[in-house]
From Swiss-Prot:
It comes from Candida albicans (strain SC5314 / ATCC MYA-2876). It holds the Pfam family Hexokinase_1. CDD domains: ASKHA_NBD_HK1-2_fungi. This is Hexokinase-2. Its main location: cytoplasm. Has antigenic properties. Elicits a specific immune response in systemic candidiasis human patients undergoing malignant hematological disorders. GO terms for molecular function: ATP binding; D-glucose binding; fructokinase activity; glucokinase activity; hexokinase activity; mannokinase activity. InterPro entries: ATPase_NBD, Hexokinase, Hexokinase_C, Hexokinase_N. Monomer. Residues 21-467 form the Hexokinase domain.
Length: 484
């Protein structure tokens, strides 16, 4: 038995005999900078652990480490019907989740397209729209009405502070939203008021982050799940810590939240290493950071998330073409000069090209960028995409290893979601290999820590958290800070 995990990613077996010595020479420093050794990964993990600890301290640190106020592990025996909503960038998702009590569930969902003006509408327009969609959904599912109020979990993936699980004070809008009168205020009573107006029996019992939802949903179905992870446009992790090991909660919890109580932590660790201490940044990473809307922030995210993979490739290609005059000679580079013109689909398609002459890459550059490529150029493009994808995957596991080592997990299922995890070629195999490199597990044993596909965090996760919260509230237990 060897590993039984994903096999290492296959690199293209092609010769570089037709690639010019000058181009091969230019590739060497890129290969050196983007190849991350096992020793370097272990050093990053060690620093990551100290940053996680700092985030939990009273003084705080780069990583926010936000208590999620989920203080019970799901057992898988939870039952009942729960609503969940997820306010995305283009639609509102409404889900009815029926928890079966045997680590099983059944879902019914609808998506409601957001009107074009909604992201800059008034506060009342937003909440009234959500309430109207909820009423339409509930009336269809329960034409004869509900016998008792439906508990609702609200996935709100915008920066919000919480002193208890059934509140969320919006810090600032992101993702193109800009509605006046909501920032700095608790969104839960606003939604509850709108729901009351339409006369539908719904109680908003929990407001959650999607990563915390991923953690809890996966724990409901998988007793080995220890972590929820997002690898997509953003990166994040969530896990359960213990109240007594969270110094910033010292003296702030009610007496019915004992020191041994578990506490879900939404890490928001895209901000790891904002002080530029450990991550080996290239000049391309520095340029991306300096030209970003928030320089100096989200350092870790900018080196691994899907949003930046294509931009790193674009910057290297532009340097090879414009400064070094090694590729795309005599071509119009106007489209290539547009920042972020190459999204994550570019390196993804480049790595997926199954043809020996990389004809898919040729089509991609011709159709999207107006650039005719030679076969040697395409080999270099492919090699660069592999280097960038490999680096992203290897960095991605550092948060996993750090949390496992911090909590003393020797075995774990780490439940992952997001476009990079689900769609980027080779990502699963590369992350599995990176974990082996960090831990140096024997080759003849099954990998004890593995990344697995997550359950639906914003739907099932929100519902399970609503179930756990409803149980606490019925028992008269606290769901937040002392006095909150």
């Amino acid at each position: 038995m060897v590993h039984l995990g994903p096999k290492p990613a296959q690199k293209r077996k092609g010769t570089f005999t037709d690639v010019s010595p000058q181009l091969l020479e230019a590739l060497k420093p890129i290969q050196e900078q983007f190849t991350i050794s096992a020793d370097k990964l272990r050093a990053i993990v060690k620093h990551f652990i100290s940053e996680l600890d700092r985030g939990l301290s009273k003084a705080g640190g780069n990583i926010p480490m936000i208590p999620g106020w989920v203080m019970d592990f799901p057992t898988g025996k939870e039952t009942g019907s729960y609503l969940a909503i997820d306010l995305g960038g283009t639609n509102l998702r409404v889900v009815l989740v029926k928890l079966g009590g045997n680590r099983d569930f059944d879902t019914t969902q609808s998506k409601f397209a957001l009107p074009a003006h909604m992201r800059t509408a008034t506060s009342d327009e937003l909440w009234d729209f959500i309430a109207k969609c909820l009423k339409e959904f509930v009336d269809e599912i329960y034409p004869d009405g509900c016998s008792e109020p439906l508990p609702l979990g609200f996935t709100f993936s915008y920066p919000a502070s919480q002193n208890r699980i059934n509140e969320g004070i919006l810090q600032r809008w992101t993702k193109g939203w800009s509605i006046d009168g909501i920032e700095g205020k608790d969104v839960v009573p606003m939604l509850q008021k709108a729901i009351k107006k339409v006369g539908v029996p719904i109680d908003v019992v929990a407001l959650i982050n999607d990563t915390t939802g991923t953690l809890v949903a996966s724990m409901y179905t998988d007793p080995e799940a220890k972590m929820g992870l997002i690898f997509g446009t953003g990166v994040n992790g969530a896990y359960f810590d213990v109240v007594k090991d969270i110094p910033k909660l010292e003296g702030k919890c009610p007496s019915d939240i004992p020191p041994e109580s578990p506490m879900a932590i939404n890490c928001e660790y895209g901000s790891f290493d904002n002080e530029k201490y450990i991550l080996p940044r290239t000049k391309y990473d520095v340029q991306i950071d300096e030209e970003s809307p928030r320089p100096g922030q989200q350092t870790f995210e900018k080196m691994i998330s899907g949003y930046y993979l294509g931009e790193v490739l674009r910057l290297i290609l532009l340097e090879f073409a414009e400064e070094k005059k090694l590729i795309f000679k005599g071509q119009n580079l106007d489209k290539l000069k547009v920042p972020y013109v190459m999204d994550a689909s570019y390196p993804s398609k480049i790595e997926e090209d199954p043809f020996e002459n990389l004809s898919d890459v040729a089509d991609l550059f011709r159709e999207k960028l107006g650039i005719e490529t030679t076969e040697p150029e395409r080999k270099i493009i492919r090699c660069l995409a592999e280097l960038i994808g490999e680096r992203s995957a290897r960095f991605s596991v550092c948060g996993i290893a750090a949390i496992c080592q911090k909590r003393g997990y020797k075995t774990a299922h780490c439940a992952a979601d997001g476009s990079v995890y689900n769609k980027y070629p080779g990502f699963k195999e590369r992350t599995a290999q990176a974990l082996r490199d960090i831990y140096e597990w024997p080759a003849d044993v099954k990998d004890p820590i593995i990344i697995v596909p997550a359950e639906d965090g914003s739907g099932v996760g929100a519902a399970v958290i609503a179930a756990l919260t409803e149980k606490r509230l019925k028992e008269g237990k606290s769901v937040g800070l002392l006095g909150a």
